């Protein structure tokens, strides 16, 4: 008999063994009082055929402590762990006896059967079959490692006869696969499925998709339009090395494996090319290297680079026992999910953390030729950071006098692109000239005055560029929280104490944010789940968490540290749903002013909509610590506020315009009512009121001194402090909650319209947009003055009281003429002392830190209730 093939009867018994074992176990469990069946089992059940020796008998007959020296001694060595109690040699035959005090014999046999038969198969199988079994075992291990870690509860697996029996049946069935499987795929029967092992090695000469001259590539493998695997992101590299291995199950070879490469950005992903592999062309059990050329029919690049990977296709039985994998997956689901969700790659951290600040002061232009343009402005770009200067009327020497701060990354190309643009009467924009600055070539901590000639036109730009190192930003886990270390916290507190108030005035403080978790988020995917991540913004500083996949209650447990440049900044935390290569979906947002932070206390914030005016679905848990120097914060209050990066311009909205008109109307009505009150006093409509007003007027005018002006304003602060205004958030919140403000797009696609009519439409739109902005500024200015006296921001109100008290004392002891003289000398000599100083109004800079009524509504913390979700409210109403 051929030793390589089992007998038909043995094969049939081997296939039915798992079913019989399961049935016997169920009977024993149902009748525990019934004694177990101790009938002797046929000795061929442990052998493939009559010609194969009984391995258990061979070991039993061997002298104890000495290996068996028979003809098959090299194949009958069984580990000592297999010789457990309950299996003893009865005689020279192969019958076994089981003790009634031990476990059921069928369980012990099932637990040892897989090992014994595997040894037997390896002993007598042909070399080709041995390679096939070994290959299948390797891929089983790879698939197990991808599905999750090994379970940490061995009693759940070792005691399961179903699992071991199915493993034994699988190994035996794999022996019946023909040895000529590598000749081609046409000879394979239809019930087979396949496992495709992909070793993603590297990419070469990929295309540039970022402004800094590099890309952040990652790879997606798709089959039938579904994404089966997504690689990690390699940041700032056109020759990335992934070195990732993945095993994908394949049901049919009549399809193509799509390989797509994307460039990862903060909000979207750019396409970098694709390729495909025809699965039917692959050879079984053979690893082949494939160099795939990337192509994109919509791109103008001829060479988009290549992707290098190894592919290996193996065959698996179609009726594979699925519960084997489901058991392991169920046992290790929590552990594998925890490892995947808590993984934040070092490359992602490195990509977010900047190590320097580039301060650029745009002073003026010299002999700039504007041509037919009527207005001019400057755009500055460093990587994906972009600023736009204010627009000035056409001039040969335009004076901008603006300052911009960029983040500097030492591992990236530090090329600053500067463009001068012009506008004509028809609002057409045209680039007038460009110039570049290599930031890496500039010295540190030194103001560099540069006169940069423009490339494509006459003229030059004069600016100051200063590169300052920055070491206050970090991303870490909860276990390595910076402020959790008492010594480090003491050191940071000492750095921002009052004794160091005049050292590095721009370094105001430090903010630490613990992003713990979110709950009850909106389901953005069709599966009823979301892939949420958090974006934290403090001014122009942005950091983000990793993505937690398929979860509406994600736990990030990350710690973010921001350097504070302005204590009046607002921390904006936005939750997005990652959507692959598409822009992320909005899941909620919350705005937290720094001065309203309660140190060291975990807080639950109700998420709001994009306009921060209505409650959205879900909550987020944050814990924040704020350490700052009050003197530095006060000095920074009277300097120009930091400009924001260029964002999409706001479009004309009728609802926003109506809201701003109402805001201006309220301020105007307050002034009108005051004038009517004075008029009523003059007309003696009320005798008592007019008498009191007349007496106050006579006493004030007779004894008036200049110090009384700040003193009167100080008394208003005291009055409102003693009797605080009820309802910090005005009634505007009620009207805004019932109004959904959405930007409306006004498009005109009719090609038959005359140019004159189009120009008129543009002109009217510009005028209305300007009126809208002016009305908003006026309304905000009046509301900020009111909120300053209402103690809306105690820090600013206290600072104003301190300044007014000092002004009262100064005006009391120093004559007015000397004060005016000092002020005039300071104004006239300011340019002589500092030629590059930027003019500003300290009072307006102070008021810009006070929130308006709209901002008060946006920054207000909503109360957490059981039905905080508007969706639940609607459902309950139905």
From Swiss-Prot:
Might play a role in the development of cardiac outflow tract. Keywords: Calcium, Developmental protein, Membrane, Metal-binding, Repeat, Transmembrane, Transmembrane helix. Residues 20-46, 60-163 are annotated as: Disordered. One of its GO terms (molecular function) is calcium ion binding. Its cofactor is Ca(2+). CDD domains: C2A_MCTP_PRT (cd04042), C2B_MCTP_PRT (cd08376), C2C_MCTP_PRT (cd08377). The chain crosses the membrane at residues 697-717, 802-822. GO terms for cellular component: cytosol; membrane; nucleoplasm; synaptic vesicle membrane. Residues 69-83 have a biased composition (Low complexity). Residues 177-292, 334-452, 494-607 form the C2 domain. Ca(2+) 3 binds at residues 525, 531, 577, 579. This is Multiple C2 and transmembrane domain-containing protein 2. Ca(2+) 1 binds at residues 210, 216, 263, 265. Changing residue 235 to C: Found in a patient with left-sided obstructive cardiac lesions; uncertain significance; alters Ca(2+)-binding affinity. Ca(2+) 2 binds at residues 210, 263, 265, 270. GO terms for biological process: calcium-mediated signaling; regulation of neurotransmitter secretion. SMART domains: C2. Its main location: membrane.
């Amino acid at each position: 008999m051929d030793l390589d093939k089992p007998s038909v009867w043995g094969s049939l018994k081997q296939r039915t063994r798992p079913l019989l074992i399961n049935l016997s176990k169920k009977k024993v469990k149902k009748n525990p009082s019934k004694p177990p069946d101790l009938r002797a089992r046929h000795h061929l059940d442990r052998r493939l055929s009559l010609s194969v020796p009984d391995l258990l008998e061979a070991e039993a007959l061997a002298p104890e402590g000495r290996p068996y020296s028979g003809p098959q001694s090299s194949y009958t060595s069984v580990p000592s762990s297999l010789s457990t109690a309950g299996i003893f040699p009865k005689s020279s035959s192969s019958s076994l006896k089981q003790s009634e005090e031990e476990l059921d014999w069928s369980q012990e046999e099932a637990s040892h059967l897989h090992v014994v038969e595997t040894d037997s198969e390896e002993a007598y199988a042909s070399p080709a079959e041995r390679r096939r079994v070994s290959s299948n075992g390797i891929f089983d291990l790879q698939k197990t490692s991808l599905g999750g870690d090994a379970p940490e509860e061995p009693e759940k697996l070792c005691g399961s006869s179903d699992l071991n029996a199915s493993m034994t049946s699988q190994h035996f069935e794999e022996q019946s696969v023909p040895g000529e499987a590598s000749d081609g795929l046409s000879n394979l029967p239809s019930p087979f499925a396949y496992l495709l092992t992909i070793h993603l090695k590297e990419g070469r000469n990929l295309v540039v998709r970022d402004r800094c001259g590099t890309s952040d590539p990652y790879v997606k493998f798709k089959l039938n339009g579904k994404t089966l695997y997504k690689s990690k992101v390699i940041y700032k590299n056109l020759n990335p090395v992934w070195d990732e291995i993945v095993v994908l199950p394949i049901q049919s070879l009549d399809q193509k494996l799509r390989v797509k490469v994307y460039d990862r950005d903060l909000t979207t992903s750019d396409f970098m090319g694709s390729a495909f592999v025809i699965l039917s062309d692959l050879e079984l059990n053979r690893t082949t290297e494939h160099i795939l050329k990337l192509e994109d029919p919509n791109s103008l690049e001829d060479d988009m680079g290549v992707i290098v990977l190894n592919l290996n296709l193996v065959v698996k039985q179609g009726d594979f026992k699925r519960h084997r994998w489901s058991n392991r997956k169920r046992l290790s689901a929590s552990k594998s999910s925890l490892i995947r969700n808590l993984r934040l790659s070092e490359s992602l951290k490195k990509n977010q953390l900047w190590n320097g600040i580039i301060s650029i002061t745009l002073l003026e232009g010299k002999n700039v030729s504007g041509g037919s343009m009527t207005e001019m402005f400057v755009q500055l770009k460093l990587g994906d950071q972009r600023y736009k200067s204010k627009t000035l009327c056409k001039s040969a020497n335009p004076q901008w006098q603006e300052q911009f701060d960029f983040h500097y990354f030492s591992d990236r190309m530090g090329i600053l692109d500067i463009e001068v643009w012009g506008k004509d009467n028809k609002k057409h924009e045209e680039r007038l000239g460009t110039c570049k600055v290599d930031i890496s070539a500039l010295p540190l901590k030194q103001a560099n005055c540069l006169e940069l000639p423009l490339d494509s036109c006459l003229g030059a730009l004069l600016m100051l560029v200063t590169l300052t190192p920055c070491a206050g930003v970090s991303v870490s886990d909860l276990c390595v929280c910076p402020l959790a270390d008492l010594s480090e916290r003491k050191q940071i507190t000492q750095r921002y104490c009052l004794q160091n108030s005049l050292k590095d005035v721009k370094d105001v403080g430090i903010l630490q944010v613990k992003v713990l978790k979110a709950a009850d988020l909106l389901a953005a995917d069709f599966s009823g789940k979301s892939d949420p991540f958090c974006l934290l913004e403090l001014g122009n500083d942005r950091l983000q968490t990793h993505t937690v996949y398929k979860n509406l209650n994600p736990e990030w447990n990350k710690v973010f540290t921001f350097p504070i440049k302005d204590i009046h900044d607002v921390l904006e935390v936005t939750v997005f749903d990652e959507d692959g290569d598409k822009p992320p979906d909005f899941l909620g947002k919350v705005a937290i002013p720094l001065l309203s932070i309660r140190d060291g206390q975990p807080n639950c914030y109700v998420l709001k909509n994009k306009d921060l005016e209505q409650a959205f679905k879900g909550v987020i848990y944050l814990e924040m610590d704020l350490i700052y120097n009050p003197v530095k914060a006060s000095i920074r209050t009277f300097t120009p506020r930091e400009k924001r990066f260029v964002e999409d311009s706001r479009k004309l909205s009728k609802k926003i315009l109506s809201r701003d008109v109402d805001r201006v109307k309220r301020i105007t009505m307050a002034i009108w009512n005051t004038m009517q009150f004075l008029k009523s006093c003059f007309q003696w409509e009320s005798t008592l009121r007019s008498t009191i007003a007349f007496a106050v007027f006579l006493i004030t005018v007779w004894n008036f001194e200049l110090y009384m002006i700040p003193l009167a304003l100080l008394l208003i602060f005291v009055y409102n402090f003693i009797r605080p205004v009820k309802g910090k958030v005005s009634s505007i919140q009620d009207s805004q909650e019932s109004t959904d403000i959405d930007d409306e797009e006004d498009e005109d696609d009719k090609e038959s319209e005359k140019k004159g009519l189009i120009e008129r439409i543009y002109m009217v739109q510009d005028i209305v947009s300007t009126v809208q902005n002016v009305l908003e500024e006026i309304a905000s200015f009046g509301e900020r003055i009111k909120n300053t006296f209402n103690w809306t921001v105690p820090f600013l109100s206290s600072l104003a009281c301190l300044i007014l008290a000092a002004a009262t004392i100064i005006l009391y002891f120093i004559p007015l003429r000397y004060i005016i003289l000092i002020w005039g000398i300071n104004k006239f000599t300011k340019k002589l002392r500092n030629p590059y100083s930027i003019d500003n109004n300290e009072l307006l800079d102070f008021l810009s830190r006070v929130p308006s009524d709209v901002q008060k509504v946006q920054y207000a913390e909503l109360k957490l209730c059981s039905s905080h979700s508007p969706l639940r409210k609607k459902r309950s109403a139905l």
